[in-house]
Regions:
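RNA substrate-binding interface of SAM-dependent RNA methyltransferases
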Residues: 71-147
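N-terminal positively charged helical leader segments and presequences
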Residues: 1-70, 121
Length: 147
């Protein structure tokens, strides 16, 4: 199952459009057509089953057919981890934390940390990609770094 993400949809939404990049990916790369079924999440535990109503290169509009809400975990898992010198190791950690269902991640800058600057935009994209690839319905919250 391919999972797509749109943070603006709610239980009351009936029709919505993907942004230009996501629309291009759906129509050009995945070659989806009108009446194809897509699964979309808003990162808050909802899984929406949708049908494509308009498929063009720059705009993909879908109609929500049904939705389900995943039961939240009994426990909230919050990890606070210092970024490593090699950025790819921290990115790998973010992917795995998302896949196992961590709810919140806080980078910690310690006295002897070799990495003092955190690229939160890049890390947010990694969390989003990991959520979609692992079919996870909850997007972890990435907090600002603390010292």
């Amino acid at each position: 199952m391919q999972l797509f993400y749109n943070p603006t949809i709610t239980e009351t939404t009936e029709v919505f459009s993907f942004d230009k990049d996501e629309s291009r990916h759906i129509i050009k790369v995945l070659r989806k057509k009108d009446t194809d079924i897509l699964h979309v999440t808003n990162g808050l535990g909802f899984l929406f089953t949708t049908e494509i109503t308009l498929a063009s290169d720059s705009k993909c509009t879908v109609k929500i057919l049904s939705f389900e809400k995943a039961a939240p975990s009994k426990f909230r898992l919050h990890l606070a981890v210092a970024p490593t010198k090699m950025n790819d190791r921290y990115e790998w950690f973010l992917e795995k934390a998302t896949e196992i269902g961590i709810h919140e991640i806080t980078p910690i800058i310690c006295d002897h940390s070799e990495r003092k600057i955190i690229n939160t935009e890049r890390f947010d994209k990694i969390l989003l990609t990991a959520m979609k690839q692992s079919n996870e319905l909850f997007l972890p919250k990435l907090n600002n770094a603390i010292t």
